[in-house]
Amino acid sequence: MVKLSSIIKARKANALAKKNDKIKKKDTDKGIRQKHSKKEGKDETLKRDVEKFIQNVNSEDTPSEDDSMSMDAFLEGGFEELDSANSNDAGSSRKRKNLPNENTQDSTSESSEEEEDGLESYQKQLEGLKEKDPEFYKFLEQNDQDLLEFNAAETDAMAKEIDENERLKSSSGKIVLTSDTIQQWQKLLETNHSLTTLQKVVQAFKAAAFLNEEEAEDLKYTISDSKVFNDLLLLAIQYVPKVLNYHVPIQEDAKGKKFINTDSKVLPKLRPVLKSYGFSILRLLEGMTDAKNISLLLREAQNVLPYMITYRKFLKQFTQATVEVWSSTRDDSVRFSAVVLLRTLCLTADITLLEFVLKEVYLGMARQSAYTTVHTLDKINFLKNSAVNLFLLDAESCYLIGFRYIRQLAITLRNTIHQPSKDSRKPVQSWSYVHSLDFWARLLSQAAWLSREKGVASELQSLVYPLVQIALGVIMSSPSSQLFPMRFHIIRSLIYLSRHTGVFIPLAPSLFEVLDSSYVSRKAKASTLKPLDFDVELRASSSYLRTKVYQDGLIDQLLELLSEYYVLYATDISFPELVIPAIVRSKRFAKRSKNAKLNRGLLTLVNRLEQQSKFMTEKRNQQKFAPIDSDSVEQFAQTIDWQQTPLGIYVVTQRQTREEQRKLIRESVQQDQEHKEQMRQKKKQALKSDDIELDDLSEEEAEDIDE
C-alpha cells in the first residue's frame, strides 16, 4: 500500500482551516491580497496534497513499515496511533504542507494558460491514481466525490461564488440583502414558521426602517436596492404577524376585544423581537411619504397590536404617530386605514391606555380644525365623525374625557367673560373652539340615538345641559356683527343636538337678534365682492360690513336656520303655541322694513308656520287624551311624518336649493384659490428661470400675485 501520511496531514489541515477566519491570497491582476472563504482554502489545500500524493504514487516510492497500513485500519481510525508514533514524519508532513501554500502565493501571477495546463495535469494524475491504486480511488469516490469532479468549470463557478460573496459584503462588513435572500426567508416563514428566520427578518426590517441614519451603523444588514427594500417591507409587514399568530394565537372575547395568552412559553423569547419590530414600524410610519405604503403599513400593523400591549412607551408613541397621520393626511385610503388601526387599538387597550388614545384623537382633531377652508372642510367633518365612533366604543372612558374637556371649554369661556380683552376672546372665537362644540354635540347626539336603540339610559345624557349652556354663552359673549357666521355655526350644532336628543333649546332669541341688527334692517351699499361662504368663514372681514353681499348672506342664513329650528317641533302637539311669538315678531318687522328680499322671505316663512299651526291644530282636535298624558303625547308626534307637513315640504325644498347654491359658491372659491396657486407657482418659476422675467407677467396676474 502506498504512503498515506500526506493525506492524513491534509485532513488535519482541513480541520485547522475551519478555525481560520480568512486566507490571504495575492490578486492575479492587481497584486493585492483578497479575502477568500474557508471553503476555498479547504479545497485548495486538499487539492495540493492530493496532487503531491499522486506524484508520490506515480514515482513508485517504496513504502515504509508504517505505510503498510490497510485501508480498513485507516477508516477505523487506527491512523491516530500511527500518526502519534511517527512524530518525525508528522513534522516533515507539516513542512511539506506549508510548502504548497508558499508556492501558491508566489505563483499567483502566472497566466491563465498555465492554470489550464495545471488542471489538465491534475486530471491525468487522477487517471493514474485510478490505475495504480484503485482501492484508494474508490475510497475517494465514496467520501470526497467533489475532489474527483474538480474541473475548470467548477473552478469558474467557485470563483464566481466567491466574487458574489465579496460583493455582498459592504465596506463596513455588513451583509447586503438580495432578492434571493428575501425569497428564502419567505419560504421558511410560510412552511416552517421559523423563529430563527423571524429574528433575521426583524433585524433586516430594522435596517430598512433606519436606512441612512446613525442607528443603522451598528446593524447587521444593509440594503442597496429599492426593489429589495420594497420586498423586505412586504415580507416583514405581512408575514411577521402570521408567524406570531402561529406560535401565540390571538383570541377575541364576546365584546370584540383582542388579546393573547400571556402565559405562553414562547412569548418571553419573542419580547426582544417584538420590541424591535414595533419601533421599526414606528420609524417607518414617521418617515414614509408614499400613501400606498402607509396604508399597507397601517392595515397590517393592527395584527401585531395585541402582542405590543405591554410596551407602553411604544404604544404611546405609535398612537401619536397614527393620530398625526389620521389628522394630517390628504389621502382617503390612508385616513380610513388609520381609523381602523385606532379602533383596533381602542378595543385592545386597557382603560388607562384607552383614555390616552381618545385624548390624542380629540387633540389631533382640534389641532387640524384650527385651519378651516373649502379644501379642508370635508376632512374636518370626517375627523369629527370618525372620532365620535372611536369615543363611543367605551361609554365610561367617553364620559370621563367628555366631562374633562367640556369643563375645559367652560373654563375658557368663563375667563373670556370675567376678563374681556382681545387676547382672552381669541381662544373662544376660534375654529378649534367652534369645532370642539360641534364635535361634542355630534357625540352626545349619537350616544342618545344608541341609548334609544338599546333601550338603556346613557350617562352621557348628563353632559347635554352643560354643553348647551356653554354654546349659548359663546353666542351671548360675541354680539359683534362680524361674528354672525360663528353664531350660525353654533346654532347649527345646537339644532343638530336638539334633533337627536329631543332636548328643547331656545334658539329663536339668538336668531331674532340678527334680524334686529342694523346690518340686516338698514339699507346696504352695493359691492362687487364675491358672496361670503358661511360654511368656511368664522368672522366676516371689514370689507364685507354694510355691503349688499353680506346682508343678503345674513338673510339667507337667518331664514334657513329659522325654518330648520321650527321644523324640529313640526309634529309636536304644542307647535301652534310655540310659533306664535315668531309669527308676531316677523310680521311686525316686515311692516317697517324696506328690504324687499327680507320681507318676501319672512312672509313666506310666516305663511308656512301658520299653515303648519293649522295642520297641527286639526290633528290635535281629533285626539281625546289630555296634555298631561306624556306617553300619548309622544305617540302622537311619532304618528306624523314631518316631511309630509306644510312646513316639512317647504324645508325639504329649501334644503335642495341651498345645497345647489353652496355647491356653486364652493366651486367659485375653489377656482379662485387654484388660480392664485397657479400665479404663485408661475412666480416661483419666473424667479428660478434665467429666461423668464417678472416683467412678462400681465398686470392682472401681478395683482393676483400681490393679493
UniProtKB/Swiss-Prot annotation:
Quote the biased-composition stretches of kind Basic and acidic residues, using this chain's numbering. Answer: 18-32, 40-52
UniProt keyword Phosphoprotein present:
yes
Kindly list the GO CC terms recorded for this protein.
Answer: Noc1p-Noc2p complex; Noc2p-Noc3p complex; nucleolus; nucleoplasm
Q: Where in the cell is it found?
A: Nucleus, Nucleolus
Coiled-coil-forming residues are: 659-700
Entry keyword set:
Coiled coil, Nucleus, Phosphoprotein
| Annotated region (Disordered), positions in chain | 15-122, 667-707
Q: Which domain of life does the UniProt lineage start with?
A: Eukaryota
UniProt biased composition (Acidic residues): 692-707
Query: InterPro entries from the entry?
Result: Noc2 (IPR005343)
Q: Which GO terms describe its biological process?
A: ribosomal large subunit biogenesis
Q: Does Disulfide bond show up as a keyword for this record? A: no
| Residues with the Phosphoserine modification | 112
Record family assignment: Belongs to the NOC2 family.
Name-wise, this protein is Uncharacterized NOC2 family protein C1142.04
